[in-house]
Amino acid sequence: IMPSLVGSEMCIRDSLWTGKDVYISHDKLRITTLSVNDDMAVIEVYAQLKNIIGHGLEAECLIEIKKDGQKTASDTQRVVFRSEQMQAVRVQIPIEHPKKWSPKQPALYECHITTKFDDKICDEAVSNFGIRVLALDPVHGLQINGETVKLRGTCIHHDNGVIGAETFKEAEWYRCKRLKEAGFNAIRSAHHPMSRAMLDACDHIGILVMDELTDMWDKEKNTYDFSDIFEDEYNQWINHMVEKDYNHPSVIIYSVGNEIQEAGTKQGAWINRMLCNKFHELDNTRYTTNALNGLNCAGRRLGFIMRDVAEKFGMDSHGSGSGGGSNALNSFMSLMSGEKGEFFAKHPLVSEALEECSQSCDITGLNYLSGRYELEHELHPAKTVLGTETYPADIENLWKLVETYPHVIGDFTWTGYDYIGEAGVGIFHYDGNANFTSIYPERLGYIGDIDLIGNRRPISYFREIVYGLTDKPYIAVERLEHAGQTAGKTAWMFKDNISSWTWKGFEGTTANVDVYSSGDEVELFLNDKSLGRKPAGRENHFTASYEVPYEPGTLKAVAYQKDRKLGEYELSTAKSVTKLKVCRVTENERNIAYIKIWLVDDNGTINSQEAEKRLLHASVVGNGVLEGFGTANPSSEEDYFSDSVTTFDGSALAVVRWKDVKSKEPAVLKVWTDDGCQVMINIENN
């Protein structure tokens, strides 16, 4: 049975913290930016200290602020304790010519605190922090240090692909870097508090964070979910979440929930306001939202709304949902796109359902309700709006809304990185089977801009162009194995295409080729012969489409803006696979290393054709073990903990874990195929 999402048990590493006579309470060190300009920043350092000795004493607390190892400011406090008493230290420290933190320049400082008693060090604590201030209004949107920032966001789940739900620093940094390289500047942690390792990665790399409390409150979505203990646990979870997040400059928004079943009820409105108030009580430097879904919020109103939708568009008023839980909702939601989605989003009963929950949040968070963005401003002109979850293929229209309306502060796509669970939502079926029905052996959502092992898919490059981050064009070819066939699709799906011009056996077959470009024109060349110029750019949905009879060789696209060349992109046909190429894609590792493996020909050109797939075998000797081995294949019986895997789209990923992280002995990974290809890589422990 495929669970809705992976990771139902404990999957985040824990630590034991120790301290002596006067210790610094864990997660009770807080650094707050009070003010900042180019000349001066003022921060407040707050720490809770505990005397565990059975008598009173006077201790010393030294606070040092460092940047790149150099001390920039300091302060010393004398602290008097009574027996076994907790005492708080609060001090304001000026920092001259501060380096401000932002996604573009994620400058970090270190706050070092040392407690001493009888001239002996009792405890030490270090926390990274960033100097930055936030502002929010419907005229300027979201501002960081006075500069308006639009959130180019993605939702991500917490699994790390071929190593499952394990949390390693290296795994989180790898995902974070790939997302930043793809043009994202924000992550929504769906639907759980983000790991410390991912928060650290976001701080250093420059990714903004919406951290999310939970996927449900009192009403269950699936049997034995968090709703069973929500009333008993939410207060403690919020406390832990704020303590965990407070010193991370990347965290800017707390989400109190996702698609909450009771959000449109009086009880839901009460819980929502209570949760938002609790977050603000603990942290008044950040903003709150709730990822509201019109279908959930509608509740008993839904029948009346769907009746009106059915009358308007001539469809079944019961939709396509069956059963219950998350999958039924997602199946129903596939109807909520296009014109039907616009009509649904603006329905007066949807407005009524959203009213109370959205009003008690700082930011109105909307899932799949982009049709309400303009209406929300008419109804609540003092509020800002955020697309907390949206369809990937709608990015062109969604980003136009973000750019057009100042009160719309960003967009979070579902999803930027593929994940285990919700099997089938993005898998293309050409045999008449329905999507999102978890047909064995489907296991992945397969709707990530980036696939499970970190490869960017065509929609990722399309999105980067829509964002306005690159002038370089990109070529995507619909898979010729399915030429002339029609696939079933959900609203989350883009196109079944790949950036490849290797289609052995399909010579003469017409290929549907898209060239994505910000330029007003593109020109496509097949083996240096022009296939003509076509319009592209914003006015043509950033896409020029060609029908090209396949022949081996080169396929090159050149982008122009008013006849000025912007950039070019070229594909070459790969010959038969003769080699394996490996590359270490993580850096500064302490626990694990990621090794990407590609099938290539004699010239090093990657061969991603299905007909050329190979069964790979792997072994590790020396100071290492094979922690995970797999591909981005969304439907496979192979597991990630075997030493053999079949390539998918010409690649695979091996994750090696060191047996002894303190040892300098390397691990050696060997990968080979049954037809004689072999490669080895020596993995040094950094």
Regions found by a protein language model. Name each.
Residues 1-7, 12:
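Single conserved hydrophobic/aromatic residue that forms the stacking wall/gate
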Residues 9, 16, 22, 47, ...:
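Substrate-binding clefts and catalytic carboxylate motifs of secreted carbohydrate-active enzymes
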Residues 13-32, 36, 44, 98, ...:
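Active-site-adjacent substrate/metal-binding segments within catalytic domains
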Residues 40-79, 89, 511-530, 555-559, ...:
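Beta-strand-rich binding/interaction modules
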Residues 46-137, 549-552, 571:
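Extended acidic/polar, glycine-enriched regions
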Residues 56-62, 104-110, 510-512, 518-520, ...:
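Short flexible loop/turn segments that cap and initiate beta-strands
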Residues 124-129, 564-575, 677-685:
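Edge beta-strands of extracellular beta-sandwich domains
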